Curated annotation (Swiss-Prot):
InterPro entries: ITPase-like_fam, Maf-like. This is dTTP/UTP pyrophosphatase. The lineage of its organism: Bacteria, Bacillati, Bacillota, Clostridia, Eubacteriales. The record marks R11, T71, Q155 as: Important for substrate specificity. One of its GO terms (biological process) is nucleotide metabolic process. One of its GO terms (molecular function) is dTTP diphosphatase activity. Transmembrane segments: none annotated. It comes from Clostridium botulinum (strain Alaska E43 / Type E3). Nucleoside triphosphate pyrophosphatase that hydrolyzes dTTP and UTP. May have a dual role in cell division arrest and in preventing the incorporation of modified nucleotides into cellular nucleic acids. Pfam families: Maf. The active site is at D70. It comes from the Bacteria. Its main location: cytoplasm. Belongs to the Maf family. YhdE subfamily. It catalyses: dTTP + H2O = dTMP + diphosphate + H(+); UTP + H2O = UMP + diphosphate + H(+).
């Protein structure tokens, strides 16, 4: 059966290759702003991922396995999504530096043939080293932080500022592979 990744993220595409030899990419038009945060961060990221997957499901004319994900960063119960601009990125990194934060990914796998929907989430704790304003600005000049939740990429230059991680590394990159592997085995 065809596998579809509902994401434009290059990082997610690179990670999924480790689990699937072949897959197609379809980018969802789902408006993440429609999802309202209620009580649980886990539920919130799962609902965003579900919205993306359902958007793709509605567009399909054939059966498929659909994979979608959403990743956010939280600090002191505040959600840090992708920065709006360089100043927003600076402020996010300034908040994170020298502290511990959590990265949450919601993952959804849909088997349209079985009409099966699996939802899950993974949380990883990340500790950032202390950084001065000059280090933060130099990092932002690379443009790496601008399209990433929490304004950093652990798999890129941003990784040099990570002091410690507790949990799934791939979750911080954007696709928790171990959890996804288990979900795919259940879906197929």
């Amino acid at each position: 059966m065809k596998v579809i990744l509902a994401s434009a993220s290059q990082r997610r595409q690179e990670l999924l290759i480790r689990l699937c030899d072949e897959f197609d990419i379809m980018v969802s038009d789902f408006d993440e702003e429609k999802v309202v945060f209620k009580n649980s961060i886990d539920e919130y990221v799962q609902n965003i991922a579900l919205g993306k997957a359902m958007d793709i499901k509605e567009k399909l004319k054939e059966d498929a396995i659909i994979i979608s994900a959403d990743t956010i960063v939280t600090l002191d119960d505040k959600i840090l999504g992708k920065p709006k601009d360089e100043e927003d990125a600076f402020n996010m990194i300034k908040l994170l530096q020298g502290r511990s934060h959590k990265v949450y990914s919601g993952v959804v796998v849909i088997n349209t043939k079985k009409d099966l929907i699996l939802k899950n989430s993974v949380a990883t704790e990340v500790v950032f080293s202390k950084m001065n304003d000059n280090e933060i600005r130099k990092y932002i000049e690379t443009k790496e932080p601008l399209d990433k939740a929490g304004a950093y990429g652990i798999q890129g230059i941003g990784g040099i500022f990570v002091e410690e991680i507790r949990g799934c590394y791939y979750n911080v990159v954007g696709l928790p592979l171990n959890k996804l592997k288990t979900m795919l085995e259940e879906a197929i």
